[in-house]
From Swiss-Prot:
The lineage of its organism: Bacteria, Pseudomonadati, Campylobacterota, Epsilonproteobacteria, Campylobacterales. Keywords: Ribonucleoprotein, Ribosomal protein, RNA-binding, rRNA-binding. GO terms for molecular function: rRNA binding; structural constituent of ribosome. InterPro entries: Ribosomal_uS15, Ribosomal_uS15_bac-type, uS15_NS1_RNA-bd_sf. This is Small ribosomal subunit protein uS15. It comes from the Bacteria. One of the primary rRNA binding proteins, it binds directly to 16S rRNA where it helps nucleate assembly of the platform of the 30S subunit by binding and bridging several RNA helices of the 16S rRNA. Forms an intersubunit bridge (bridge B4) with the 23S rRNA of the 50S subunit in the ribosome. GO terms for cellular component: cytosolic small ribosomal subunit. Pfam families: Ribosomal_S15. Belongs to the universal ribosomal protein uS15 family. Part of the 30S ribosomal subunit. Forms a bridge to the 50S subunit in the 70S ribosome, contacting the 23S rRNA. It comes from Campylobacter concisus (strain 13826). GO terms for biological process: translation.
């Protein structure tokens, strides 16, 4: 379920604050969203893959924490990011 390096590099390039930025919350959230999307598609096919389902729940929780951090830290970046990724605001 891991992202291939070309797709990962494309996501990092799109959401990075500067060149070589892989640790900013925006990049981390975008990468987690891509992994969550892939795992969701996998689980639509393999409904009884419970270990992958647990991994999906962990990824969703991690993304939720990062989104909460970004919302408190920089709301304008947060709102721009969720609109680009197609996420909902609580």
């Amino acid at each position: 379920m891991a992202l291939d390096s070309a797709k990962k590099a494309q996501i990092v390039a799109k959401f990075a604050r500067k060149e070589g930025d892989t640790g900013s919350p925006e990049v981390q959230i975008a990468l987690l969203t891509a992994r969550i999307t892939e795992l969701t598609e996998h689980l639509k096919i393999f409904k009884k893959d419970f270990s992958s389902r647990l991994g999906l729940l962990k990824l969703v929780g991690q993304r939720k924490r990062l989104l909460k951090y970004l919302k408190n830290k920089d709301y304008t970046t947060y709102s721009k990011l969720i609109s680009e990724l197609g996420l909902r605001d609580k």
